[in-house]
A protein has these predicted regions:
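Accessory DNA-binding and partner-docking regions appended to nucleic-acid-acting proteins
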Residues: 105, 121-340
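A short, charged helix-loop
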Residues: 79-107
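Short, surface-exposed recognition loops or helix-turn segments adjacent to catalytic cores
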Residues: 60-63, 92-101, 131-142
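Catalytic palm subdomain of template-directed nucleic-acid polymerases
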Residues: 70, 109-110, 123-124
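Conserved RNase H-like, two-metal-ion catalytic cores of nucleic-acid enzymes
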Residues: 1-79
Length: 340
């Protein structure tokens, strides 16, 4: 244990200790009367889910709450500590060797600082959410974090997460096979996808269509481990399957790039910025660039068009796309104008 947070002593738990059961921690995660406060919880939750099939519930994510409360996009913990707790954060141990045991006193202090300020930040942000009536907005986002589907990637669907510029069905078929192999390989060996090959390497492979290990050797982006052995064999088999299949994927109907979409997407970006500024919410929490392109191309089954996002932005985005409203610059600000 170490320095106290507002609610009592802060404690370090070392999951690398041989034979240590994390079940008491997971029991706390399941305890419904105790709110678990995290900052940027998603990666932590993915670990807990795959390790034990458990989520800390109820959960409060200070990064999401801060984005709803006007602190900007993907606001860092250090920023919140400075602005809300008004404390400095010693980052000198950030890049030390965390696998070495025992941890140094400086490392322990650094690790404990990740929680010692969370209570003050939580209390401040919940008070802000109560004032603005936006607690339900945060609850919507947390519900996504606590949904097992958020962390399950099925190999057959992995290609849908790869961003591509080409809508060629044959190219997409090769992307699909390469993504399927990568996902299966990563899951079987419990390694990150990027350790197999990154998205940019996947796109390069789908474009160059290597058929031999000699072809793989010419890749600019493939890691050395991917040029031989099981990964190389998997890549070559995936490319061959993608070239030979008759089951060609169809580009999504809301795929960006159809004629006339670019201008509308730009108008939607202006509307998003204006609406986000007016609501003091980070724009990226409302809609991504891909969401705007999809709306401009006719996509309607999108998070940006439902729930609290529809109130803030989505409803007017659809009206703008339908020509029912226009945008006007007035007194240095963007205004929505009804079209009669």
């Amino acid at each position: 244990s170490g320095p106290k947070s507002a609610g009592g002593p802060a404690v370090l738990i070392d999951p690398m200790v041989d034979g240590l059961s994390l079940e008491p921690l997971y029991d706390l995660f399941r305890h419904k009367a105790t709110v678990k406060v995290f900052h940027a919880a998603r990666q932590d939750l993915e670990i807990f889910f795959h390790d034990a099939g458990v989520f800390p519930d109820p959960l409060f994510d200070t990064q999401i709450a801060a984005m709803v409360c006007g602190f900007g996009e993907q606001v860092g913990y250090e920023t919140l500590v400075k602005k809300i707790a008004r404390q400095p954060l010693d980052k000198s141990s950030r890049f030390t060797d965390w696998s070495h045991r025992p941890l140094s006193e400086a490392q322990a202090t650094y690790a404990l600082a990740d929680v010692t300020h969370l209570r003050a930040i939580y209390e401040y942000l919940t008070a802000q959410l109560d004032k603005t009536g936006r607690a339900s907005w945060v609850a919507e986002e947390v519900a996504v974090l606590l949904d097992p589907e958020t962390y399950i990637t099925r190999p057959d669907e992995a290609w849908e997460r790869v961003r591509t510029r080409s809508g060629s069905p044959r190219f997409l078929a090769i992307v699909r096979e390469l993504a399927r192999f990568r996902e299966s390989y990563a899951q079987e060996r419990d390694v990150p996808r990027s350790r197999v090959y990154k998205d940019d390497a996947l796109i390069e492979l789908a474009s160059t269509k290597p058929l031999t290990e000699g072809d793989l050797a010419k890749s600019r982006l493939l890691l050395r481990e991917g040029r031989r052995g099981d990964i190389a064999a998997g890549i070559l088999a995936a490319v061959k399957a993608g070239l030979e299949t008759r089951d060609l994927p169809k580009p999504a109907p809301d795929e960006p790039g159809r004629p006339g979409n670019a201008a509308l997407a730009e108008l939607l970006r202006v509307l998003l910025k204006a609406k986000a500024d007016a609501a003091s919410v980070a724009p990226k929490l409302i809609a991504s660039a891909a969401d705007l392109d999809a709306i401009a191309s006719g996509g309607r089954d999108l998070p940006a068009l439902s729930g609290w996002r529809a109130e803030v932005f989505g409803n007017d985005a659809l009206r703008l796309a339908a020509g029912e409203i226009a945008l006007s610059a007035q007194d240095g600000a963007v205004k929505v104008v009804e079209v009669h």
